[in-house]
């Protein structure tokens, strides 16, 4: 991510983008099963642009604090969908709850100054990014 202020931010954003990419690939069979479109919605580019603008305009903790309500709403929404979904789809539906909870964990741990903020995301990746060397 070219707007990253430093290598650590670049790693964080890269890891979260990797989680998004792998999740989209994992969901495609589920989407096909229900006749849902496989192409990405045009709104995702606009959402990314909004996140980039917020990152550029705010210090790290303010940026994270601004994301928190949105991510919390995603967790709630996917939990409701999982609760309403059929038993045969629970693995996929629950995986989306876990996916969103990884973002909550990242935000909460970063805001608390704790290490391992990306652990919940990394454990879901088949192709994790290499951790940058610290000086």
Q: Locations of the language-model features?
A:
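Non-heme di-metal
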Residues: 1-135
